[in-house]
Regions:
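Conserved adenylate-forming
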Residues: 1-5, 13, 93-94, 100-119
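Conserved ATP-binding/catalytic segment of the ANL
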Residues: 1-61
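Generic recognition of flexible, low-complexity loop/linker segments
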Residues: 37, 47, 73, 83-86, ...
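C-terminal boundary motif of the adenylate-forming
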Residues: 40, 45, 79-105
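Short Gly/Ser/Thr- and Asp/Glu-enriched loop/turn motifs at secondary-structure junctions
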Residues: 54, 90-94, 164-166
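Short hydrophobic/aromatic beta-strand micro-patches
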Residues: 54, 60, 98-100, 172
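Conserved C-terminal "lid"/linker of ANL adenylate-forming enzymes
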Residues: 84, 125, 150-214
């Protein structure tokens, strides 16, 4: 079943009875016979279970709505120009996002470089961009690029409830990196570090909160 906070709870003969010699952990994760998975998800009408995120990563908006950032972030990353998406919304009136651009897609779609000649290494992609007399800021600060992404965001927003929809976004001047502490070695985003590194950009998204938050 799904708890009030969205966490998936399991019960059955195939579920463990507890942790070996660790009653404290057992009492934490198994309450009234229900195993608390730590996953957030939903169960459809046919009984299929869908995991949408981890409970520890769930945002709670200022109006008390639970928001699973990972699902929204992965959906927005389907936009070709987007490399990374970082959702903001915990204790906020509405959701916003930080986007980084996919330089490989810029080289292919905006400059017309043959995809077979585009290097995989991000630093080499930046060099190719510069070799073609462009800088990344030519695109991160480009109004047409912003409008193109905004159109895609508005379409994808229709897949989510109003509290989950991205109302504002910022295109960052560079991608997230391992060296800056924003990505793990397996390229998962580190939320705390991104919040710290880009705090001013995040604050700017909430200077004026005149949006429809439903």
């Amino acid at each position: 079943k799904v708890a009030d906070d969205g966490e998936l709870l399991l019960k059955g003969d195939n579920i463990m009875k507890g942790y070996y010699n660790n009653p404290e952990a057992t009492n934490t994760d198994i309450i009234d016979g229900w195993f608390h998975t730590g996953d957030v998800g939903k169960v459809d009408e046919e009984g299929f279970v869908f995991i949408t995120g981890r409970k520890k990563e769930i945002y709670v908006s200022s109006s008390g709505k639970n928001i699973a950032p990972l699902v929204i972030e992965e959906t927005m990353k389907s936009i070709p120009l987007i490399s990374q998406c970082f959702l903001i919304g915990d204790d906020k009136k509405y959701c916003s996002a930080l986007f980084t651009l996919d330089v490989g897609v810029i080289l292919r779609d905006k400059i017309g470089i043959d995809i077979n000649t585009i290097p995989k290494d991000p630093l080499q992609q930046i060099k190719m961009l510069e070799d073609n007399s462009y800088t990344l800021s030519d695109f991160t600060e480009n109004e047409d690029i912003f409008n193109e992404i905004e159109e895609s965001v508005n379409k994808l927003n229709m897949e989510f409830s109003n509290p989950e929809q991205i109302k504002k976004f910022k295109i960052l001047p560079r991608d997230f990196t391992i060296d800056d502490g924003e990505l793990t070695p397996t390229l998962k985003i580190r939320r705390k570090q991104i919040n710290e590194n880009w705090s001013k950009a995040i604050q700017a998204l909430y200077v004026s909160e005149n949006v429809n938050d439903g």
